[in-house]
Regions:
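Active-site-adjacent C-terminal substructures of enzyme catalytic domains
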Residues: 18, 22
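Terminal or standalone catalytic/regulatory effector modules within metabolic enzymes
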Residues: 30-37, 41-170
Length: 170
């Protein structure tokens, strides 16, 4: 432990992020490290793609909110291991919540009238497996809109593959 607080380290990171904006016409994306990935627990590759994704949705001016919401969503979901596709679920839900002015306190009530992103529906349906701690049940019900989640390993639902037949087709 260095003894440095994240806020203290964040100051120069924020400064240099602003400086880089002045030279963005020469830039092709995130080229420097940032403490944000530690503060918000956003995987590096996803962080690099997050700003363009947020900007493409017209939320560029709310990027800081999206990063804060990423951390909030991560906590709401029980801090799942963030690898593709689960990191996408956290990011998609964070963007969705900012886009719709949702909070952890109002998402269940207001979410009843909203269509959630496909990745979030797939996650809560169990298509990426089930977290050991389970899903937040009230949120799962709102996201699935009456659809039943699966309770088995998702691969078990796939039809068997006839490799001999596939070999003939290829």
């Amino acid at each position: 432990d260095t003894g440095l607080g994240l806020r203290r380290v964040q100051e120069p990171s924020t400064y240099w992020s602003d400086v880089r904006l002045r030279y963005e016409s020469f830039d092709h994306g995130l080229k420097t490290s940032t403490t944000d990935i530690y503060r918000y627990e956003i995987p590096g590759g996803q962080y690099t793609n997050l700003r363009p994704q947020v900007e493409s949705l017209g939320l560029g001016d709310r990027f800081e909110e999206v990063k804060e919401m990423y951390k909030t969503v991560n906590d709401m979901l029980g801090d799942p291991v963030k690898v593709t596709p689960s990191s996408k679920v956290v990011g998609d839900l964070a963007i969705f919540m900012v886009q719709n002015d949702l909070t952890p306190e109002n998402i269940v009530e207001r979410g009843k009238a909203l269509a959630f992103p496909d990745s979030v529906v797939s996650y809560f349906k169990g298509m990426m497996g089930q977290p050991a701690w389970g899903f937040p049940e009230d949120l799962q019900k709102v996201v699935l809109k009456g659809e039943e989640p699966i309770t088995c390993r998702p691969g078990k639902l796939l039809p068997p593959v006839d490799f001999d037949q596939l070999e003939q087709e290829v």
